[in-house]
Structure formats: C-alpha cells, structure tokens
Amino acid sequence: FIMGRSENSRNRVFDPVPERGGICTIAADPAKLEDPSLIIYNPVLTLGKTHIVTNGDQTDTIYDLMSQGKSFADALRTRTFEPDGPNYTPRISAVVYEDGSYQMSILKSADGNGDSMQRYFFDYPQPVAGEGHFISTYKHNGNPIPSFEGEPLRFACPRTIGDFAQGLWSSLNPDNKVSLFARVIDLDSGETGDMIFNKYDAVCSDLDDPEAVSYTHLRA
C-alpha cells in the first residue's frame, strides 16, 4: 500500500500493467502533478515466476539485474535511500519466489544521517503457513520522520485475499491512505489473483480496461 501526506503524493492511483505482471502508479489528475520523480514508478513487477514489490523505482533495478542472473541483494546494493532529506525515505523491497519463500530488505539512513547508508536483508526460506511479515518506511511520526527499525513484524494472514485486503485497507489512516494492491498466488499452478483499492478516481485512465480481467478494482 502507499500513503500520502502532501497533495502531490496523494495524487496517485494504482494502474495494472498486465504485460509485465504488475502495476504502476499514475497521477490521478495529471494537471496537479508537481514532481513525479519519487511518486511515479512500478510498485509490482513479475519476472518469470518471481514477484517483485517495492516502494520505489528500485523495482525495475531488481527486475533488470535479476533477469541478468544477479540476486535480490546484488540489485539493492546498487541503490540507496531516497534523496528527500531530512526524512531520507527508506527503500523497502521484497521478492516472492516460485516455492513461496521470500526475501525482504530496507535501505535507510543512519538515524537521519544522509551521509551514512545502512542496508538490511531478511530471508524467509521456509515460511510458516498462515504467517506473514511486514516492513514499512517509517516507525512513527516525527520531524524528521524516524525510519523503521528492527526485524519485519509478524502478522497472521486471513484465509482469503478479500479478507486480507479489506481488513488492511480499512485499518489504514483514512486521511493518508492512497492505494492498496493485494495478490494471491497458487503455489501449485502459479496462477495469481489481484485486487486494487484506490481512494481517488483517475481523471483520465484505463483502469477499467477489459483486458485486465484478473484485476478487481475498488474505490474507497
């Protein structure tokens, strides 16, 4: 999911990119778009049977380098946190593999020090059934906003994608939430089912593209 505090960061919706097995962010109202550099990107892409999800344009870095035989960690060692001091927004990323194992990462500054880079990687080769892990950009509000700390948080996964997505969407701050994407993967067949929640309607978009039949779109 993505959140927004400024008008520019709230001016977004998730739009499916079926030819790449993922989604992109687009401006809900292009006339109000101020700076696209850190808010327009591909949050989700699929490389073969590997699913990549991040909070920035490092999605493409991971996709490109993994397609060349590099690893998730190799790709992220070429990147750093976002250049938006004094917050220096962390880059958070994850990959889910064909067998259901997954890896996560956060790239962040050292307590807001823009001259010091910290990279953390978390590997889950044998996930526990019914359990997931959560990592976010920030720990809580502040000035500057402190980055997430520690290991990813564990949570219990609901049995259906609908329960999971609806529960998560309803729990997000109603003023700041922008969009949510959820995906369920059949580990036997590799087939996927996706849901997209967008708080705002796009002024001009193809969100109802009939070719994107595997996507369920909801407004809230």
What role is predicted for each listed range?
Residues 26-29, 33, 44-74, 79, ...:
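Alpha/propeptide regions of enzymes that mature by internal proteolysis
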Residues 1-34, 157-214:
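Extreme N-terminus nucleophile/cap motif
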Residues 47, 110-165:
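C-terminal, well-structured catalytic/ligand-binding subdomain of enzymes
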Residues 216-220:
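Conserved small/polar residues in nucleotide/adenosyl-binding loops
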Residues 1-3, 51-60, 95, 103-107, ...:
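Short hydrophobic-aromatic micro-motifs
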Residues 41, 48-50, 89-92, 102, ...:
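Short, surface-exposed beta-edge/turn micro-motifs
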Residues 58-116:
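Short histidine
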Residues 1-2, 42-44, 90-97, 104-105, ...:
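Short beta-strand scaffold segments in enzyme catalytic cores
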